[in-house]
């Protein structure tokens, strides 16, 4: 126990010092009216990407951000002239702001300071992408460790506490191997499967945390497991030090976990549990939608992806974390007609907005361009 306490003290000192070096920067409460220059978008809606000076070229760049930039560079929206641009993107990677990550970029503030001040313009009309915020132990979502100015933030795991509605954009979290482009009009699922062909009512297979933020719900789900039509299995095996923190249930849970195949559960479950992890969002959300399973989201305060344009009430079930143990009763009382509607909507949402990195990137722009069009249309009628 003393060794564990020492470990926590070292971690606190280490990451506490990181916070002292990067004090929280209060974000301006922006709106499209006070932090966006619509005049830059009056004639065209072009996207400009700030170049990387040689001294920043060795900064790590994640596979995901490389693909996002590649798509915009090759799109009809791209311009290499900042005077033509409506939207501006940073050339440096801001997607991973966890200081422990190999993709964390330390010198983002230096990069921003190197930009032409008249083009950066305190972040106005800029769009910043972020998928991971904060780090152990609290995964703070209020500070990206650089000054975002008046920029819009397109981010995963958006919280009601930090998300500026009709200004920021809520993103899905996806793996780097998420399809870059898909030429087919439909996602690769057996769309002919009907709900009564799926043998499990609801399932979840994933890691649980025996301590810290995000541990609450995942430590509860074993109470729902019956090994028949409700499968809820978790493992403590994650990170190299998991045995230091294992509890009395870990070995039993690990053994049960190994009995079930993740993909088989996704393919054969009507509903799939999507509990929060350390952060609010999870890869499981897109994986669930892609498999044709209806997501049951348990993540208080999470702003679901693209909620500005997607009615998630028609494609997912959202349950408060405090009500997690009532999920079987809720799902069993859902009519077959309602289940069919949910699955069809979930399938359509995935195909229309989420099936590739290109589609996701384009929809971010589409949301912003729609705001611009609404503003211009409103002014024309005044």
Curated annotation (Swiss-Prot):
GO terms for biological process: heparan sulfate proteoglycan biosynthetic process; nematode pharynx development; protein glycosylation. One of its GO terms (cellular component) is protein-containing complex. Disruption phenotype: RNAi-mediated knockdown results in the failure of hermaphrodite-specific neurons to migrate to their correct position associated with a defect in axonal guidance. Keywords: Endoplasmic reticulum, Glycoprotein, Golgi apparatus, Signal. Residues 1-20 form the signal peptide. It holds the Pfam family Exostosin_GT47. It comes from the Eukaryota. It is found in: Endoplasmic reticulum; Golgi apparatus. GO terms for molecular function: enzyme binding; glycosyltransferase activity. InterPro entries: Exostosin, Exostosin_GT47. The keyword Oxidoreductase does not apply. Glycans are attached at residue 268. The keyword Acetylation does not apply. Does not display any N-acetylglucosamine transferase II (GlcNAcT-II) and glucuronyl transferase II (GlcAT-II) activities when expressed alone in vitro. Belongs to the glycosyltransferase 47 family. Required for the biosynthesis of heparan sulfate by positively regulating N-acetylglucosamine transferase II (GlcNAcT-II) and glucuronyl transferase II (GlcAT-II) activities of glycosyltransferase rib-2. Probably not directly involved in chondroitin sulfate biosynthesis but negatively regulates chondroitin sulfate levels. Maternally required for normal ventral epidermal enclosure and for embryo elongation during the early stages of embryonic development. Interacts with rib-2. PANTHER family: EXOSTOSIN HEPARAN SULFATE GLYCOSYLTRANSFERASE -RELATED, EXOSTOSIN-1. This is Exostosin-1 homolog.
């Amino acid at each position: 126990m003393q060794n564990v306490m020492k470990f926590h003290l070292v971690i606190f000192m280490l990451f506490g010092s990181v916070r002292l070096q990067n004090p929280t920067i209060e974000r301006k409460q922006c709106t499209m009216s006070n932090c966006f220059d619509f005049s830059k978008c009056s004639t065209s809606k072009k996207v400009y990407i700030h170049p990387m000076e040689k001294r920043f070229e060795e900064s790590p760049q994640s596979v995901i951000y490389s693909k996002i930039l590649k798509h915009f560079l090759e799109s009809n929206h791209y311009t290499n002239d900042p005077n033509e641009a409506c939207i501006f993107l940073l050339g440096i990677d801001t997607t991973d702001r966890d200081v422990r990550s190999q993709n964390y970029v330390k010198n983002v503030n230096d990069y921003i300071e190197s930009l032409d001040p008249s083009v950066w313009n305190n972040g106005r009309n800029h769009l910043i992408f972020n998928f991971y915020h904060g780090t152990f132990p609290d995964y703070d979502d209020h500070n990206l460790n650089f000054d975002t100015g008046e920029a819009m933030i397109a981010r995963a795991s958006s919280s009601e506490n930090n998300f500026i509605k009709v200004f920021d954009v809520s993103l899905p979290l996806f793996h780097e191997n998420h399809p870059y482009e898909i030429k087919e009009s439909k996602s690769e699922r057996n769309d002919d499967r009907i709900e009564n062909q799926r043998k499990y009512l609801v399932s979840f297979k994933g890691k649980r945390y025996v301590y810290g933020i995000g541990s609450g719900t995942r430590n509860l789900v074993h109470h729902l497991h019956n090994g028949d039509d409700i499968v809820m299995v978790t493992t403590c095996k994650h990170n190299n030090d998991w045995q230091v923190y294992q509890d009395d249930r870990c070995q039993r849970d690990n053994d049960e976990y190994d009995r079930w195949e993740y993909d088989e559960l996704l393919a054969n479950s009507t509903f799939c549990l999507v509990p929060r992890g350390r952060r609010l969002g999870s890869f499981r959300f897109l994986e669930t939608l892609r498999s044709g399973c209806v997501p049951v989201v348990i993540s208080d305060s999470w702003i679901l992806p693209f909620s500005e344009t997607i009615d998630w009430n028609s494609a997912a079930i959202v349950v408060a974390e405090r009500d997690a143990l009532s999920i079987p009763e809720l799902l069993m009382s859902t009519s077959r007609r309602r289940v069919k509607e949910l699955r069809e909507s979930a399938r359509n949402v995935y195909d229309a907005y989420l099936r590739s990195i290109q589609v996701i990137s384009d929809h971010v722009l589409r949301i912003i361009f729609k705001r611009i069009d609404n503003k211009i249309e409103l002014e024309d009628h005044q």
